[in-house]
Amino acid sequence: MDKLKIEASGALAGNVVISGAKNAALPILMAGVLAETDFNVSNVPNLRDVNTSCELLRCLGAEVTRSGTDKVCISTTNLNEFCAPYDLVKTMRASILILGPLLARYGTADVSLPGGCAIGARPVNLHLQGLEQMGAQIEVQEGYIKARVDGRLKGAHIFMDMISVGATENLLMAASLADGETIIENAAREPEVVDLANCLIAMGAKIEGAGTDTVRIQGVESLQGCDYRVMPDRIETGSFLVAAAVTRGKIRCTKADPKSLEAVLAKLEDAGANITTGDDWIELDMQGKRPKAVNIKTVAYPGFPTDMQAQFCVLNALAEGTATITETIFENRFMHVPELSRMGATMELEGNTCIIHGIERLNGAQVMATDLRASASLVIAGLVAEGTTIVDRIYHLDRGYEHIEDKFKGLGGHVERVKS
């Protein structure tokens, strides 16, 4: 099992090219099941979760071809299996997103209950309730969701009890091939949801209101393949910007999307960073200054993203002052705190709030990644810690960051992948 070995690196400097968004690519790849002709997707990151998604589609009988560094072509001509097995689904929670497309196009789907990061329960009930409102018969038996529909799904007026990105995406895809109009209220507004909707529209779907809390979908008879480019990864972008802020450096993120990161950029400015942006780039300059502590509360988009919470824990650990970070999206999402404490960070947990007292420096240590974003925070901490930091279990990192050690090296970071 690989590890990352990290040495104190000084101020990061230079340009880093941002990859396609994992959280947009995964539902877009699943949407390929809806297309009757070849579906070509570009700017697809080379990640463990993307590879799992491609393997899942192949398991169903789809032909999946990867070309170049970022292109995937999906053909469903020979798709003849409708079961997403446990061995694949257990490693990736986003596998649940195959449920809506299979059910909408083929009328049947058996999907193992999902795995992925160990961040709270994250139940799938919102996905199932919405599909049942659209006429699906659903049972959960022996760890599998078994869904059937006679004929086509029917449009429905769905009010979601809580905001769920995954459920919004599943219902968007299912409703695109349903009879009649579907209205989703209290829908997720995340940019990745909008990216999926734009992709479905390019395939022939009729969708209005994506990016607002009320989305209307008029079902169509069929969807066709198209050429679609996945949006930039806003969380990868934010992670590199925080790393630059913590190391008091100056970097430019290219092929980025500033509009999708407004809440994060505002907090970085509060921390003392100079931020400049263009249409597809973001530059951060700390001018050698120590960051200031910033209070954070994670909320659904367009608020501060939960996927950036761990990285800001590191920023506040080294900042001037005391800050609180409150997590309102997922329970059990402070598993990085004990690991950062091993490196000398001064942090206290009170329920869903972390109180962080900034200190001058961290110390290198052997630490363990517990989930995807926590692992990124440990890498950032290692860049500024005195001595050597070893991050174990980096398979979490490989689920969401493409060539992270190479990108940090390009900015002057001393990061090396080593075998156990």
Swiss-Prot record:
Active site: 117 (proton donor)
GO cellular component: cytoplasm
List of residues binding UDP-N-acetyl-alpha-D-glucosamine: 93, 307, 329
Modified residues annotated as 2-(S-cysteinyl)pyruvic acid O-phosphothioketal in this record: 117
InterPro entries in alphabetical order: Enolpyruvate_Tfrase_dom, Enolpyruvate_Tfrase_sf, MurA_subfamily, RNA3'P_cycl/enolpyr_Trfase_a/b, UDP_GlcNAc_COvinyl_MurA
PANTHER family to which the protein is assigned, alphabetical: UDP-N-ACETYLGLUCOSAMINE 1-CARBOXYVINYLTRANSFERASE
Protein name per the record: UDP-N-acetylglucosamine 1-carboxyvinyltransferase
Lineage: Bacteria, Pseudomonadati, Pseudomonadota, Gammaproteobacteria, Alteromonadales
